[in-house]
Amino acid sequence: MIYHEIYDVIVVGGGHAGTEAALAPARMGLKTLLLTHNVDTLGQMSCNPAIGGIGKGHLVKEIDAMGGLMAIAIDQAGIQFRTLNSSKGPAVRATRAQADRVLYRQAVRTALENQPNLDIFQQEVVDILVENNRAVGAVTKMGLTFKARSVVLTAGTFLAGKIHIGLDNYAGGRAGDPAATMLADRLRDLNLRVDRLKTGTPPRLDARTINFDVLAKQHGDAELPVMSFMGSVDLHPRQIPCHITHTNEQTHDLIRNSLDRSPMYTGIIEGIGPRYCPSIEDKVMRFSDRNSHQIYLEPEGLSTIEVYPNGISTSLPFDVQMGIVNSMKGLEKTRIIKPGYAIEYDYFDPRDLKPTLETKAIEGLFFAGQINGTTGYEEAAAQGLLAGINAALQVQGKEAWFPTRDLAYTGVLVDDLCTLGTKEPYRVFTSRAEYRLLLREDNADIRLTPIAHELGLIDDARWARFNQKMENIERERERLKQIWIHPQSEHLAVVNELVNSPLTREASGEDLLRRPEVTYDKLTQVAAFAPALDDKQAAEQVEISIKYQGYIEHQQNEIERHKRHENTLIPAEFDYDKVESLSNEVRAKLMQHRPVSIGQASRISGITPAAISILLVNLKKQGMLKRGEL
């Protein structure tokens, strides 16, 4: 049966990538359908109950700046908020929130159900319709066909998913959910490179059986941050602490003695796991010199007894998991509610994607999330947003859009994936960005909200608030420029208490704020520079933009130099075989990756500066040398 209505965009999957991918085109005015195997698990946190962190918090802010949902949802569901790296520079400061799983899922579902232009339908998808090399719809398990002008696939770990606990394994997309086996088989028939990855999750513990009295507490920040630029502390639910315990030699001995029952160490699992979130087995073996590892006991919500022991992800047998848990301080009598497990799943080589996340092989088919080789809710959501935007733009007949590396961490993420590919689950870090001083959490809206407005992703309220913030920043910077302190000023004594070396000549408020020891808050407590802005976001921008002005300008100059050829396009039909000066290795890599620009080509492993020069000369010779907006 063919459904009577033709959609502009169909999104398959209702996880973190799928929800953002569905909301974006709906906000842009396109008729959108979200297909999920279970509407009750929309926005489900399959692993750790947290959003944000180093690099990840930056992505969440970018999603929010573009009108996405994740930041708003966690502001309504976060039960502990912290600013990480708060003592370091603004480039690496990051917001992290512990989440109440139920509240988060409720926030996501409410947003989806109240979004105009978005329909939701519960059915497992078993096939993607492809006609004349273009995706035109999806087929569900009961034989119902939905037609569309573009399709976004966000299947997470469900494609041919296999769950491992000890030497036992079975098909599954995650605990309690079936694997998408039929869809995986169908996708393997398409002209796309497929491989396997692995991830894992720890056992869940019964809080009633944990001796919290002997454990160290970890509280959130006294001054609670918010994740969304439109957020408010008033949205946060009740805040509660986490607790900390540690593994010990007994724990490690048990793990070492059980490796013959580990699916990883016996070769049953073939997929590669996440480097930066290893299983406890991996940690014990890779860091054999350490006799202890810190484990965070994170509550899964305000209305549940489940606790997530962050740091003991494992696929060891259940009896070994019990031994691991009971070997740790405070957990001697703790019960396990859900066993930990590892899961293997299909993913597609992201080098087969355009930077818009459309597949190169099939027009109108977009991939987002873990099926592109990433790990993490935030990475998935950022991809979902980008894929949804471009699926919509394609239907509208408009030019595609994606952020560059100097504009957003989303740009770093996508460029790394599409240019270099990945053989292990990829996660974002601030260290992956060349221009991280420009890609801060605090300025994500300044970088991206005007673009979101042009694309039709944000409402009038957000746009008005953004413009008011920009006016506040400009007005305050100008005000501080105009206020001067002279050596004879009545305020000199107070100002000298703020600075490391007394003033010997006149200085403006801007001059003073450039000093490392002077903060905006301290400066505006001086009567001459009062009052401070009520708008805390604008005040933060004033301080950072003044204090780091020289460094920011230096990075912007670097970007301009780099951009001279970054955006030089390489036509899809460019024939590398005709470029005789290229080595066979370079030619083979360029033909394999098919970079869309000189900038992308330059980041492919093994592509030398000399090869880039040869490419530029040949593009010019063939009359193909042109720049594009990437």
Curated annotation (Swiss-Prot):
Binding positions (FAD): 13-18
Pfam families reported for this sequence: GIDA, GIDA_C_1st, SAM_GIDA_C
InterPro entries reported for this sequence: FAD/NAD-bd_sf (IPR036188), GIDA_C_N (IPR049312), MnmG (IPR004416), MnmG-rel (IPR002218), MnmG-rel_CS (IPR020595), MnmG_C (IPR026904), MnmG_C_subdom (IPR047001), MnmG_C_subdom_sf (IPR044920)
Cofactor(s) annotated in UniProt: FAD
GO CC annotations on file: cytosol
Keywords noted in UniProt: Cytoplasm, FAD, Flavoprotein, NAD, tRNA processing
One of the protein's GO biological processes: tRNA wobble uridine modification
Molecular functions (GO terms): flavin adenine dinucleotide binding
Protein family according to the UniProt entry: Belongs to the MnmG family.
Name this polypeptide is given: tRNA uridine 5-carboxymethylaminomethyl modification enzyme MnmG
Originating species: Actinobacillus pleuropneumoniae serotype 5b (strain L20)
